[in-house]
Amino acid sequence: MTDKIAVILSGCGVYDGSEVHEASAACTAISRAGKKIAFYAPDKDQFHMVNHVTSEDDTDSKRNVLVESARIARGTVLPLKDFNIEDVDAVIIPGGFGAAKNLCSFATSSEPQVDEDVARILR
């Protein structure tokens, strides 16, 4: 047992990343249980961005999932490609539409695929 829980983030924001309240609630529960948190996210461009004030697509911006995830983590977020299951006791993936856009292609494809690093971790 490592006393560490991995939280895999998919950016920051309910429409194009991790849902902030769900991620925060998970982190609070982990902390209250006396466990450490290790944040991970894919180091890649977000599939698409949303202006969270207007709920409209933001076609002018380009954002990185790892960088945006640091907004929630308020610190270190490790690249998902470096994840090792031996380093943690459990994995949590908070909701938000980013999970369906940045961790897989379920939101965008008629033949959806899971991100290869996510698939490796969940096997």
Over which residues does each language-model region extend?
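Extended, subdomain-level signal for the structured scaffold at the beginning of enzyme domains
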Residues: M1-R123
